[in-house]
């Protein structure tokens, strides 16, 4: 329901991706359908009593700047500031600030680079959702069989939101792309 509601908003507000010479698509497509990932995570946090507050705050920060970027382009430095800040909040949640400062700097750069590299997959029907499902399935396996690092319900809730997204994206003519809000 949330995704269908978003489609109406995106259509009214003209949140679209127009094809250009680098595009793999040829028709105008709604952008920002990946907002469903945030809503899935938010649903988990609401049900769990905000178990991971710094993670939620970081996710909200990245969702905000990425959605703004989907609506109107924001500067690279602004986005990077938000991304580094969000990663620092996640590191705090995970207790990583006990590491040497240079490990933290390297980890911030690598993790921020990875989330931005993930963004390049968006726009090819099914690849963002498919890759996300593979990663989430691997994380669910590791979480269950190797080491528990998060409540399993969190991973399963996000998997459900990715499946909803795939329903609209993994087809010959995608109804939507994840946009920065879903791929970052």
Regions found by a protein language model. Name each.
Residues 1-184:
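"…together with the soluble PPM/PP2C metallo-phosphatase catalytic core" -> "…together
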